[in-house]
Amino acid sequence: MKRTLILLAVLLLAMAATAQTPLLDSLQMPNAVRFLPPPPDTATAAFQYDRAQYRWGKEQRKDPVRLAIAVSDAVWSIDNICKIYSGVLGIDISRENTPAIYRMLTLGLLTTDQAGKLPKNHYMRTRPYVFFNEPTIYPSDEKWLRTNGSYPSGHTILGWSAALLLTEVAPDKADTILARGYMYGQSRVIAGYHWQSDVDAARLVASAAVARLHADKRFTKLIKKARKEYNKKRK
């Protein structure tokens, strides 16, 4: 009985340690409904560009390598982001190997994600796969994302925020990090889940969210620790 209670206590402590909440909520983040224009109306030239980019995305699926990347990028998780950018930085980003970088990314990305909630709920834009009634490359998300607004792209907020934050941690790898972050957003067009304008807007939302993060002293401390850890790991 005593052993069971000890194990239970350890489990509860582990769960408490891994549970993370955003540093700021959606109402504390910049409001994209106020600083960005609405998504393009279907009667505009901008929407015709969205349609053209949707066709471009379908063409990209013919490249098996690019298709595989887009499918992998469709997995929304901070651990997947860590895996993606581990290859770019040349170090294993994980809770065990790089705890400071992992914690910075976890709290940072959970917070920047908040910036997409207000505009998504406000516009509730129809996603391209729903608009065209066509399948995506990642069917498991199709059902629930039908009721989730398309503008701006939440995945792109995640991927571009990560790229910006890691550029601060590893400025020597800035170009490669940002190129991968850009590719991550384009994967959403290829997947059929987002219009190009959703992705473009999301990069601006992510940039605004990261700027807001830097006004929070708790986060600036996390960035400093992450940078110090990276400099030790790359030696």
Language-model segments: which ranges?
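Alpha-helical transmembrane segments and their juxtamembrane interfaces
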Residues: 12-13, 165, 208
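Hydrophobic alpha-helical bundle signature of multipass membrane enzymes
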Residues: 21-191, 212-215, 222, 231-235
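Boundary at the C-terminal end of the N-terminal hydrophobic targeting segment
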Residues: 17-19
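Sec-dependent N-terminal signal peptides
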Residues: 4-13
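Histidine-centered divalent metal-coordination motifs
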Residues: 155, 194, 202
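C-terminal domain-closing interface element
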Residues: 202-224
